[in-house]
UniProtKB/Swiss-Prot annotation:
Family: Belongs to the herpesviridae HHV-1 VP11/12 protein family.
Spans annotated as Disordered: 1-31
Membrane-crossing residue ranges in chain numbering: 299-319, 339-359
Organism this protein belongs to: Varicella-zoster virus (strain Oka vaccine)
SS bonds (residue pairs): none
Protein's job: Plays a role in the activation of the host PI3K/AKT pathway to promote cell survival. Interacts with and activates PI3KR1 in order to phosphorylate host AKT on its activating residues. Activates the host AP-1 pathway by triggering phosphorylation of host ERK1/2. Participates in host BIM and BAD phosphorylation, leading to apoptosis inhibition.
Protein name as annotated: Tegument protein UL46 homolog
Record-linked Pfam families: Herpes_UL46 (PF03387)
Length: 661
């Protein structure tokens, strides 16, 4: 039976020998074999090869990536707003030959999303979190008021009686994060004495909420389809939102300065201004600066006209609120003060949630279209403004890390993952050159490496590694900071030795001036940087002048040299440069010297003798009359990023520095 089948199969096969070499015998000796055996040998060659070729499903890299993109697309489509996937949007973008989204299309998508579907899942999730707490209005009131008293005691040193905790920390954080966002009406409805003013205030707050929601919606729908290629129009919009965020955080610090001063005056508390006024510019000037010179306006292209109008609406509402809180009277007694406090905390938590929403949206994807990715100066300024606010007012608010935030806002993160995967699949499994530069700017794949400094032979060969890590409220906002501080001529992390290390958890008595200790200059504080060194205390670093003399960082020119040695020379991002004169010459960095979020400047570098830290951003463009001279805000302190421990302070009059006691 088998031989008959083999002979018939072989006869049909002979007619096709010329078309497939695999049917021919590969061994001349096979001709002497019996017919069934000889035919089976030729058949087996074809059967096995075709079976392997047609039946094997081991995925190739391209197939695996394609399958992953398909699965990710299905999941993403179920989470994102239907308007983002609409036929209208896709048809318009397909007809374009660039990676920009016309603003008319952005506005159209915003209008079509009538019920705010872009945030529906997000709002439902945080509403469930609040519902699980089962807190009444009185419970929410207590959380806001108690949190403020703790914050005031921490920031001013005033003797404020703080009641014991009635709510656990998790519930308290949930309230401070989300309660003001989902509230249909304010908890404190009468913060001012006049009923008319209270009504006006509630109306302005409602306008503010609508403007904040419009900015968030605009940002959601302004994204192009390809994050791995540049988008000039989107870059301007991202910069406008980042500048708007930095301006908003500056206003919030000014607002808290006013509220804190009025509370202390109403209750006749001893107001110890430990850190000085935290906002250096009054709201009129601060907001006017953005409205006139913001990125959307200064670009002059009109590609972000609607966005500029939307951010202007929000800032205008803040300006109107400033007038009320600065001039209108509060209700009498402790109850009146408490009502004002709760209203203030509601406003601050609402704004902080809004601005951290915008920043987190940048960090999970929108920064791809910034100028140099995360090295965009406007994005860095927004991060610095948030960090500055959290440093001074971190006790009053709560901040979600980006990793926690994407659990709530899953759709945007998945959308960017899908878009990047599709682009990599289209480019043969490799990211574009532009996207590779974005990743380099994020430092996720190009960490900073510093060459270890050799220790003198008289000292042990064991490495001496010191890190100063901030686990403070600022850390919850932008990640922990590993600070390496150069004091005198040696590296140290001794917090108690001097005030050169930022320490937000320091007790109040440690912030008071110490007349018996001279403050050592703080020289270098760099984010996300670890310095692995071998060093001996009081031993000079091997960084000296050409004549062999050691470098003293308290002198401006010496400090500048050490700073350059530490951070590396300014260079093009595509090249690596080494300074042959330095023992720290093996430095790989993707940013210029000015691209660091945190940087402290010694007093002598700017011509001051007082050991004060200057906030360069706040003093930018300072002129006579810029310093707020209202009774609520003392002009005797300059704004700073860290607590100042010194007997004297510096103020500014007509751009002329003066020291006083």
């Amino acid at each position: 039976m088998f031989s008959r089948f083999a002979r018939s199969f072989s006869s049909d096969d002979r007619t096709r020998k010329s078309y497939d070499g695999s049917y021919q015998s590969f061994n001349a000796g096979e001709r002497d074999l019996p017919t069934p055996t000889r035919d089976w040998c030729s058949i087996s060659q074809r059967i096995t090869s075709e079976r392997v070729r047609d039946g094997c499903l081991i995925p190739t890299p391209g197939e695996a990536l394609e399958t992953a993109v398909k699965a990710l697309s299905e999941k993403t489509d179920s989470l994102t707003s239907p308007v983002l996937q609409s036929t209208e949007r896709h048809s318009v973008l397909l007809g374009l030959h660039h990676n920009n989204v016309p603003e008319s299309l952005v506005v159209s998508c915003m209008s079509n999303d009538v019920h705010d579907g872009f945030m529906q899942r997000y709002m439902e999730t945080i509403q469930r979190c609040l519902d699980d707490l089962k807190l009444s209005g009185d419970g929410l009131w207590w959380v806001y008021e108690n949190t403020y008293w703790q914050y005031l005691k921490y920031t001013t040193g005033a003797e404020v009686p703080v009641t014991s905790e009635k709510v656990n920390k998790k519930s308290k954080s949930t309230v401070l994060l989300f309660s003001s966002v989902v509230a249909n009406k304010p908890i404190s409805r009468h913060p001012f004495k006049s009923k008319v003013i209270n009504s006006d205030y509630r109306g302005i707050c409602q306008e503010l909420r609508e403007a904040l929601g419009a900015v968030q919606k605009y940002m959601y729908f302004m994204r192009p389809d390809d994050p791995t290629n540049p988008s000039p129009d989107t870059r301007i919009r991202v910069q406008e939102i980042a500048a708007y965020t930095a301006t908003g955080y500056g206003w919030m610090l000014w607002f808290l300065d006013v509220v804190d001063a009025r509370v202390c005056r109403h209750l006749k508390l001893q107001f110890r201004r430990i850190r000085g006024p935290r906002a250096s510019v009054i709201p009129d000037d601060l907001l006017r600066r953005h409205l006139k010179t913001g990125p959307a306006v200064s670009a002059g292209t009109g590609v972000a006209f609607i966005l500029a109008a939307t951010t202007a609406s929000a800032l205008t509402a803040l300006l109107r609120i400033s007038v009320l809180w600065r001039k209108e009277e509060w209700r009498d007694g402790l109850n009146g003060t408490a009502a004002a406090i709760v209203a203030a905390v509601e406003l601050i938590t609402l704004l902080h949630h809004h601005f951290q929403y915008l920043i987190n949206m940048m960090l999970i994807g929108y920064a791809c279209w910034g100028d140099g990715g995360l090295n965009d100066p406007y994005i860095l300024k927004a991060l610095r403004a948030q960090g500055r606010f959290l440093y001074f007012a971190g006790q009053l608010v709560r901040t979600m890390s980006t990793h926690s935030w994407v659990v709530l806002e899953t759709s945007t993160h998945m959308w960017f993952s899908r878009a990047v995967a599709q682009s990599i699949l289209a480019h043969g499994g490799k990211p574009t050159k532009y996207y590779a530069q974005v990743l380099a700017a994020s430092k996720r794949y190009t960490p900073l490496h510093l060459r270890r400094i050799s220790e003198p032979s008289s000292v042990s060969d064991q490495p001496y590694i010191r890190f100063n890590r901030l686990g403070s409220p600022i850390g919850t906002g932008i990640g922990n900071l590993e600070c390496v501080c150069l004091t005198g001529n040696y590296l140290s992390d001794d917090v108690n030795a001097s005030s050169h290390v930022i320490n937000t958890e320091a007790p109040l008595n440690s912030i008071a001036p110490d007349t018996n200790r001279q403050r050592t200059s703080r020289v270098l504080v760099r984010p996300d940087t670890g310095l692995d060194v071998t060093v001996r205390k009081n031993h000079c670093l091997d960084i000296g002048h050409t004549d062999g003399s050691p470098v003293d960082p308290t002198y401006p020119d010496h400090y500048t040299r050490i700073k350059a040695e530490y951070e590396g020379p300014v260079r093009d991002e595509s090249n690596t440069m080494f300074d042959q004169r330095s023992d720290l010459r093996h430095i790989e960095t993707q940013a210029s010297l000015n691209d660091h979020v945190y940087e402290n400047i010694p007093p002598k570098e700017v011509g001051f003798n007082s050991s004060s830290d200057l906030d360069v951003d706040s003093l930018n463009g300072y002129t006579s009359g810029d310093m707020h001279t209202d009774d609520d805000l003392s002009p005797d302190f300059i704004p700073n990023d860290v607590p100042v421990r010194c007997k004297t302070t510096v103020t500014f009059r007509k751009n002329t520095p003066k020291s006083h006691h």
